[in-house]
Amino acid sequence: MVPWEGYVSDETMGTFAPIALYWVYAGGYQLVLHRRPLERYRLHTRAEEEEKNLVALPAVVRGVLLQQLVQAIVAMILFMVTSDSSAVVVQPPIIIQAFQFLVAMLVMDSWQYFVHRYMHQNKFLYRHIHSQHHRLIVPYAIGALYNHPLEGLLLDTVGGAISFLVSGMTPRTSVFFFCFAVLKTVDDHCGLWLPYNIFQSLFQNNTAYHDVHHQLQGSKYNYSQPFFSIWDRILGTHMPYNLVRRKEGGFEARPLRD
């Protein structure tokens, strides 16, 4: 039994809940990002954000909305093709759902690592497609899904669809998986190193790890996203870092390689 049962279908929730959650979670971060009490947790100063970022917030919002429109269309098609409206979907035991969840995480990580890395290595793709995401040199939460539309389709939307299909999860399980993936992705771009943050505590691949990738020195490292750093470690693209306190307040993710 889930709260939406009897009101909307699992397929509808799987399509729109992650989008709504994105704006709630990222919007919450955006509201507090420039509050003075949180200055001591920032990975970059306000001045750095204003000076280094090459795109304004309204353009970022428009870009994210466009990606989410495409994402919703693909999700509706995917559920329409894979769901049997005449059959009663029986949820597997929790242990099976947990296994499917883990499989989906590993599949999504694998897909995104290799596509992401190739977009950096292919000069044409980087210049014309992936560089749009790196206009945010100082990442912030709302910009987590700020991508070129083609990258958004290939990296995030197709990656999510493949994770769903390979794992064999039901539409209901996918609601929780895609919402979790959205929360993790937003948190990885939040630009704040917060105490008691569960994502930053449990995952080595977190906002500081991804911040290194957005720096010039780390742009060819730390491709892994959104969950683990497995592929970076296996294939030699892992860049370690020290998290140091800045004298003027806040933190800095300082790469350890020259």
From Swiss-Prot:
Alphabetical UniProt keywords: Endoplasmic reticulum, Lyase, Membrane, NADP, Transmembrane, Transmembrane helix
GO terms of biological process kind: lipid biosynthetic process
Reaction catalysed by this enzyme: a long-chain fatty aldehyde + 2 NADPH + O2 + H(+) = a long-chain alkane + formate + 2 NADP(+) + H2O
Lineage of the organism: Eukaryota, Viridiplantae, Streptophyta, Embryophyta, Tracheophyta
Residue ranges constituting the Fatty acid hydroxylase domain according to the UniProt record: 101-237
Gene: GL1-9
Functional note: Aldehyde decarbonylase involved in the conversion of aldehydes to alkanes. Core component of a very-long-chain alkane synthesis complex.
Protein name: Very-long-chain aldehyde decarbonylase GL1-9
Pfam families referenced in this protein's UniProt entry, alphabetically: FA_hydroxylase
Tissues in which the UniProt entry reports expression: Expressed ubiquitously.
Main location: endoplasmic reticulum
EC number of the protein: 4.1.99.5
Subunit structure: Homodimer.
Family that this chain belongs to: Belongs to the sterol desaturase family.
Bilayer topology annotation: Multi-pass membrane protein
